[in-house]
A protein has these predicted regions:
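Active-site core segments that coordinate phosphate-bearing ligands/cofactors
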Residues: 2-21, 38, 42-221, 226-318
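A conserved helix-loop-beta module that forms one wall/lid of the active-site cleft
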Residues: 20-35
């Protein structure tokens, strides 16, 4: 991937020359990920009993395979809410950035995918739960339901370990007048955490070229995806419905889907048509009416405050 000019789908001659002589000949020509490369090596036939007619479909990495396994479509997002939070994005026009990773789309050669990782995920949520909700997820959820969308203009940044995106550490709280404060009431603290986590995800996704579309849907996985009230905030911030799935090992499932796609005439048949009979995700929540207006006003403010914190911690940009 790092040697590929992803827009032109050819190897970068400058990168090849920097790595090794005659590397292009050794690598071979890049091909669409649905391409059948040939039949399996006789070694695997003799050693492991593969059928000699077994065909090999072009390889991909675990993250692109996960996008295939979750069957994302244009405009969709997958959010893994675990120890670290991870976003998979389907992009039409990427904007490469140091903050995330841009890949060729594994199921549509004309489009792209992006990956964003956030280190302060479930452990940060658990810490605020312990501090502000008596170690109870039930109390945590009650606080989210008791506070209004937008949190009265109170915004928070919660990074107990150095964050990847953005590169900030510490807790920073701002009231509705954009003044930094030392603490929030417990319910406000809980909503500030969850809203802040999801606003950061949307802001940095849009920084890579992502845009929410009318048909956008969000697929949530990971431990926090079992909490409906957390998912409600996610749906409200992105103004898109959130679905959940029981599919585990999405990279393995995606590899199987891709193999099936490759054998079904490859790019001539849309990937979505090949997997349309697979189990569908379940709708968990839909956006609250009026959410779009609330967060359209708050998202730019959150982005400005993030830049303020960054400038205070590492100085103004040159």
């Amino acid at each position: 991937m790092n040697l590929l000019q992803i827009c032109d789908k050819v190897w970068s001659q400058a990168c090849l020359s920097a790595c090794a002589p005659d590397l292009e000949e050794k690598l071979g020509r890049p091909v669409p990920s649905s391409s059948v490369l040939g039949t399996i090596s006789s070694y695997y036939v003799q050693r492991y009993g593969f059928h000699p007619g077994c065909q090999v479909v072009a390889f991909t990495g675990d993250n692109p395979a996960s996008l295939a396994g979750m069957r994302l479509e244009e405009g969709d997002i997958a959010v893994s809410l675990g120890t670290s939070d991870t976003l998979f994005l389907w992009l039409r026009e990427p904007t490469p950035s140091l903050e995330g990773h841009i890949f060729c789309n594994p199921v549509d050669p004309q489009h792209y995918m992006a990956l964003l990782c956030f280190k302060n995920g479930s452990l940060m949520r658990e810490r605020i739960r312990d501090e502000s909700a008596s170690c109870s997820w039930s109390e945590f959820s009650k606080a989210l339901r008791a506070t209004e969308m937008g949190n009265g203009g109170n915004l928070g940044f919660y990074f107990d370990v150095m964050e990847i995106t953005p590169e900030i550490i510490g807790r920073h709280r701002f009231n509705a007048e954009n003044c930094e404060v030392s603490a929030f009431p417990r319910d406000v603290e809980i909503r500030a955490l969850i809203e802040g986590q999801f606003m950061a995800k949307r802001i940095h996704a849009e920084g890579l070229g992502y845009r929410v579309m009318p048909k956008t849907k969000i697929l949530a996985t990971g431990g926090a995806s079992h909490n409906r009230d957390i998912l409600q905030v996610l749906a409200d911030v992105f103004d898109a419905p959130v679905y959940v799935t029981d599919t585990a090992n999405s990279a393995c499932v995606g590899s199987a889907y891709r193999a099936f796609h490759g054998l079904a005439a490859g790019a001539a048949v849309p990937f979505a048509d090949v997997v349309k009979l697979a189990p569908q995700p379940r709708l968990a929540v839909t956006p609250t009416p009026g959410a779009a207006q609330v967060y359209e006003a708050l998202l730019p403010q959150y982005a400005k405050l993030e830049q303020r914190i960054l400038s205070q911690t590492r100085g103004p940009p040159e």
